[in-house]
Amino acid sequence: MTYEVSDSSGNKATATRVVSVYDPVATADTVNPGNKIIYLTFDDGPGKYTQGLLDLLDKYNVKVTFFVTNTHPDYQNLIAEEAKRGHTVAIHSASHKYDQIYTSEQAFFDDLEQMNSIIKAQTGNDASIIRFPGGSSNTVSKDYCPGIMTQLVNDVTARGLLYCDWNVSSGDANNKPISTEQVVQNVISGVQSHNVSVVLQHDIKDFSVNAVG
């Protein structure tokens, strides 16, 4: 699919995008691993369910990526524990408040640097991976600063940071809880469509943590 746009001065630009259409994914109870790669990622912690998740991950010898926040400061010590157990600790947001972090580039990076300082205090290392609250293509940010995501993506990359989105959602971020069984089904169904899956879960949701076990 090719797009052509022009501005008021008559400057024109074209872009070509490949759009892939897949058949609907059939409901599945298990995944035939084959050559699939699945990355488990957990946002918004650490919180009161993170310790239990860490123990489950140890049980199955699985390593994940935690995109951490400071929204539950009483659990900051678990950031160190995540790193100690061999997981990747990455930046999500200190506040996770869209109406603050997306008001300007300065506000975003102030929040990012605050969270990185917390991570470094706990682990001894700077984080090199981030996940934008809402993802890199979120639409909520335009309510506060239209066009900011394009600039932030460029700025983050220029700073040598890697930003990570997801292509499989567990569905656990809804306003109301869903069952552990539904989280499991959402993930199993979602990974069928990808050879490489990045799964989004939240370790502040007990029903989602329970899905791991």
Regions from the PLM with identified roles:
Residues Y22-F132:
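Active-site beta->alpha N-cap acidic-glycine motif
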